[in-house]
Amino acid sequence: MTALDSRNWGLTPAMETGLFQKPQDRIFIIELENSIVSFINSNTESFQLRPMNSYYRLLSHQIAEYHNLNHVLARTQDSCVILFKGENFQKIEGKPLLQELQLNKKPEECASSSESIEKSNNNRIFRILKRKEVGNECDYKIDGNTRTPNSNLTANSNKDQKIEIDDKSSTDLEQERIEKERLYEQRKQEIFDKLNKSEDDVKSTNSSGSSDSDNEWSDWLNGDDSNTQTSNGSVSSSSPFNSSVTTIQVNKPQQQFYDSRRGRGGRRRGTNNYKDAYRGQSRRNKENGGYQSGYSSPYLVYPPPQMGGNSLPTYPLMYNPAGPAPGPAPSPMVMGNNTVFMNPYMYNMNPQGSCSFGTPIPMYPPYQYQYQYQYNTQYHSGPYSNTPSYNSNNYTRSSANKYHHFQGKNSYSGAIPKRSDDSNSNKNEGIRRASVEGSPSSRDTDSVEMKFDKLNI
């Protein structure tokens, strides 16, 4: 191994560091140099190196320059270096290989020198430089057509261009940093408090508005259905609507839910029973379900206004016999000189018989449904469940009631009403007598009927 000074052979600092201070880089340099020597001794004109990082590409360029070779980057891959000999290539005789060189300094001295440089860099104190603001006002002396700057201006500009070193100590800088952080946190907290306050105000306004409406509805639903008499003797309605008479349906007719699953020949798999339209009711909300087509509601028809004799005749809605009719066929009516069929009116007619232009058309409360139902559940299974006018067999088994809503189990006799025929007529008569014996007196029944009349049902 040749012990020579590396500066005599044109070694770069990167080559010196890789050869004498970093063993991993020294291994790379030795392998690369062996490949270059084999390329020089061969007849090939170019040699492409393997892909490598930028630091090793730098060492490759410098090592190729050391051995008098030309070097370029590949066009297809920027991470590859291509070495070629060229026309004027000559092998330098007597030049040692890089792996044979050795520095005059010992490695310990090199390591100590590098450590001292690092320590000096770490101990260096950096100060914050502050540039003084330059004034915009300038003083000039104008003599004729020439302008000469004042000597004070020149001195000030020279002083402004110089960078002054801040004399603040590290403690002052730390205190300033702490103060800035405190102001930042304070400002951030104020912003968040303002946002939270605005959100709380919005929620409070929404809750107050909804609570008022909820209280109004709850008072109306939980209160008595009948009109209450005030201290002045006037009758006030508990309904939130501004109406003189309001019909309230407490117990609406039970909606019919049908099985929406696909039919397999009209039968269920694994059973011999046909589809049951009421079997799926236990899995659904019966009270607040959506609108179903099975619910039989009457047609809603607005009555045409009565016109004068000199005006054009009115053409009301005609009855379509092909359409679905929830009840019996409507009765004929004479409109003009023609006899037409009208659906039952949902609203009362104007008692005055005619209306004039410019006068608002009054609104009238609707009729009750054409099918009578038991609207009050408190009289279904209570002591007044067998009142003849509200819970008789003729009432529940009427032909007008398309969907028969059975009363369920009797609270007194424990019997379920069945279809009346010749074989069971005696049994039903006995059950009816037993229930009448357990019912209250006629006096109580009359008071109950009076309450029903007040409820306007």
UniProtKB/Swiss-Prot annotation:
Predominant localisation class: cytoplasm
Q: Where in the cell does this protein reside?
A: Cytoplasm
Q: Is Phosphoprotein found in the keyword set? A: yes
UniProt domain R3H: residue ranges = 26-88
SMART domains assigned: R3H (SM00393)
**Chain intervals with Polar residues compositional bias:** 145-158, 248-258
Q: Where is this region: Disordered?
A: 142-181, 195-291, 406-457
The keyword RNA-binding is annotated on this UniProt entry: yes
Q: Name one GO cellular component term.
A: cytoplasm
Question: According to the UniProt entry, which residue ranges have a biased composition of type Low complexity?
Answer: 226-247
Assigned keywords, A-Z: Cytoplasm, Phosphoprotein, RNA-binding
Please name the PANTHER family in this protein's record. CAMP-REGULATED PHOSPHOPROTEIN 21 RELATED R3H DOMAIN CONTAINING PROTEIN (PTHR15672), PROTEIN ENCORE (PTHR15672:SF8)
UniProt miscellaneous comment:
Present with 892 molecules/cell in log phase SD medium.
What is the recorded name of this protein?
A: RNA-binding suppressor of PAS kinase protein 1
Q: Which gene encodes it?
A: RBS1
